[in-house]
UniProtKB/Swiss-Prot annotation:
Quaternary structure annotation from Swiss-Prot or TrEMBL: Homodimer.
Keyword entries, A-Z: Amino-acid biosynthesis, Aminotransferase, Histidine biosynthesis, Pyridoxal phosphate, Transferase
Enzyme class at the top of the EC tree: transferase
Signal peptide: none
Phylogenetic lineage: Bacteria, Bacillati, Actinomycetota, Actinomycetes, Mycobacteriales
Cofactor(s) named in the record: pyridoxal 5'-phosphate
Protein name: Histidinol-phosphate aminotransferase
Length: 366
């Protein structure tokens, strides 16, 4: 068969020359590059999950529950408990990871001739999802401390009148939070919808933007995931909370039976074990503080983080520094921000290995 490349195929012109998204998956001693919860699921969760999956297996010849009402009810119960904001399943939508949730929102509210504004550096999938849905992405750069410049943000929104605005808090890759006051100012001037991406909310002490839903029912969507604090990255489950009319909107673009029977069942089990799973968050926050202090003592610059990762530098050549960590069997993330790298907070022994490597890297690059 003839060898083919992308250039030989009739793909969309704007996709030519692009690279697929994805962090390196390498077999090394310490992997701190994808912001997963390093603690494995509890034995009780695993046992219940095995039992539930076995029960579901006998029905795999049938399509799953199309609208995932039971799962959405469990998610609504969790959100109500952790935020103090009463939420029903009618206000909540779930999909295969928050990426699919965001994609569905862009399919419904973006598209050709429409725009989405974001504050980079931020989650790198946002412009990719925009491109995939043919929504024009507009960047309003963060300030030199990687925070949203409120005046610049409001001016950009007023000038460009975007259909969608992305606000990520805590922000990935920097880890800093955006205050509710700033989010309200953005909501007040935004002509379209504002998607607040709270993938790492469980690691932060800041109140959730879900508390603003009642005042901004036609504008605000808050997306979350079970991939980070929930120890469920392999389960691929994301969701958003909004007025129920937003759920009606994404139902127009979602694929039929988009959430498998096994995905729904597994996520319900994980939610029912949320207290034991989320108990690891306090451990990770304590480790984050310890690692941050260790990096500061080594002379690194750090953006204050309220997530499960640290954004640090400053390097003349951050990719060479990334390679230096990898040479020491520690895999972290080069997020293509000049001078900085990102490291996930891992188990204590993984963090020790990271700090030992960082000590040697500091001697070489700082």
């Amino acid at each position: 068969m003839k060898d083919l490349t992308l250039n030989d195929l009739p793909i969309r012109e704007e996709l030519r020359g692009q690279s697929a998204y994805g962090a390196p998956q390498l077999d090394v001693d310490v992997r701190l590059n994808t912001n997963e919860n390093p603690y494995p699921p509890s034995e009780a969760l695993v046992e219940e999950l095995a039992r539930v999956v076995a029960e579901q297996a006998s029905n795999l010849n049938r399509y799953p529950e199309r609208d995932a009402v039971e799962l959405r009810t469990e998610l609504a119960r969790y959100i109500t408990k952790c935020t103090g904001v009463p939420v029903t399943y009618e206000q909540l939508w779930a999909a295969n990871g928050s990426n699919e949730v965001l994609q569905q929102l862009l399919q419904a509210f973006g598209g050709p001739g429409r725009t989405v504004l974001g504050f980079q550096p931020s989650y790198s999938m946002h412009p990719i999802l925009a491109q995939g849905t043919q929504t024009t992405f507009i960047n309003c750069p963060r300030d030199k401390e990687f925070r949203i410049d409120v005046d610049a943000a409001l001016a950009a929104i007023t000038t460009h009148q975007p259909n969608i605005v992305f606000v990520t808090t805590p922000n990935n890759p920097t880890g800093d939070v955006t205050s509710l006051d700033t989010i309200k100012k953005i909501l007040d001037v935004a002509p379209g919808i504002v998607i607040v991406d709270e993938a790492y909310a469980e690691f932060s002490e800041q109140p959730s933007a879900i508390s603003l839903l009642e005042n901004y029912p036609t504008k605000l969507v808050v997306s979350r995931t079970m991939s980070k604090a929930f120890d469920f990255a392999g389960g691929r489950l994301g969701y958003f909370v909004a007025h129920k009319a937003f759920i009606d909107a994404v139902m127009l673009v979602r694929l039929p039976y988009h959430l498998s029977q096994l995905s729904q069942a597994a996520a319900i089990v994980a939610l029912r074990h949320s207290e034991e799973t989320l108990a690891t968050v306090a451990k990770l926050v304590a480790e984050r503080k310890r690692v941050q202090q260790g990096l500061l003592e080594l002379g690194f610059e750090i953006v204050p983080s309220e997530s499960n990762f640290l954004f640090f530098g400053h390097f003349e050549d951050q990719h060479a520094a990334w390679q230096a960590f990898l040479d020491r069997k520690v895999l972290i993330r080069d997020v293509s921000v000049s001078g900085y790298l990102r490291a996930t907070v891992g188990l204590p022994e993984e963090n020790d290995a990271f700090l030992n490597a960082a000590r040697e890297v500091a001697q070489q690059f700082l």
